[in-house]
Amino acid sequence: MVKVGINGFGRIGRLILRAILENYKNKIQVVAINDLGSIETNAHLIKYDSTHGIINEDIQTSKDGFKIGNQEIKVFAEKDPANIPWGKVGADVVLECTGIFLDKSSAEKHIKGGAKKVIISAPGKEVDFTIVQGVNSKELKLSLIHISEPTRHNS
């Protein structure tokens, strides 16, 4: 099972969590989320999505995070990615979804926090690899550390 952390719980971060819960919960475990919004607000936003509807999971909040179904997710509120303790929660991969930390040097701050790899959800600068699904995604090498996958808009 791959353990991931999500930095940024806006639209992209929430959609990634929802996709994992609905399609990959036996393969991917979200162990932590970092976002400056309150735990209660973020729990509400994942439960009730204006486009995708209500998620079919019970969500409970605590002072440290929330529980979705049987899955506990730790929540941090750090502005600096270097201060997020990804290693302590066992996150192998961090999904960078803030739209702020788009270059290699800023993405590397997640590595300082204990993550092994970083995937940037927006077009990155000076990253090891940029994936365009259906164009070069088969060229992805597991040895890469900083990966950028520009967000696709499906209409």
Residue ranges and their predicted role:
Residues 147-155:
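A short, hydrophobic C-terminal helix/tail in secreted or cell-surface proteins
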